[in-house]
Amino acid sequence: MVKRVQLVLTKDVSKLGRSGDLVDVAPGYARNYLIPQSLATHATPGILKQVERRREQERQRQLELRQQALEQKEALEKVGSLKIAKQVGENEAIFGTVTSQDVADAIQAATSQEVDRRGITIPDIGKLGTYKAEIKLFSDVTAQIDIEVVAS
């Protein structure tokens, strides 16, 4: 029978777990690598209580962030449509493209809320018209918004 040691990870370890996870590993792996590298500590009752307290705080923080994302989604959907002005050439083709940064700036101007540009998904916009953008506000909260590209 193989003996295992219970440890609490203090840092993220690839293929093993994240910081705060309780893991069972071989004694040699714990003694020779994880503990000397300060990647883990022995799982004592006091440390387990600390880990559980940290997990609960993180859970509460995630719930608050999700609630803020839902409120932000409602505010974005109330706006309806955003207008972005671009210079136009022949055949209603715009110079350059509309980027996620342009959309983020338009959102901030319309709602005074900051949105991370990396969470904005837009189609390739090369002409005037109305397009749909998807904004990821949280892992499971996304908002749809219309973008109207007009000539400046």
Curated annotation (Swiss-Prot):
UniProt-recorded Gene Ontology molecular function terms: rRNA binding; structural constituent of ribosome
InterPro entries: Ribosomal_bL9, Ribosomal_bL9/RNase_H1_N, Ribosomal_bL9_bac/chp, Ribosomal_bL9_C, Ribosomal_bL9_C_sf, Ribosomal_bL9_N, Ribosomal_bL9_N_sf
UniProt key word RNA-binding: yes
Coiled-coil zones: none
RNA-binding recorded as keyword: yes
Gene Ontology cellular component list: ribonucleoprotein complex; ribosome
Superkingdom as given in the UniProt entry: Bacteria
One Gene Ontology biological process: translation
Alphabetical keyword list: Ribonucleoprotein, Ribosomal protein, RNA-binding, rRNA-binding
Family affiliation: Belongs to the bacterial ribosomal protein bL9 family.
HAMAP family per UniProt: Ribosomal_bL9 (MF_00503)
The protein's role, per its UniProt record: Binds to the 23S rRNA.
NCBIfam families from the UniProt entry: L9 (TIGR00158)
Alphabetized PANTHER family for the sequence: 50S RIBOSOMAL PROTEIN L9
Protein name per Swiss-Prot or TrEMBL: Large ribosomal subunit protein bL9
Gene: rplI
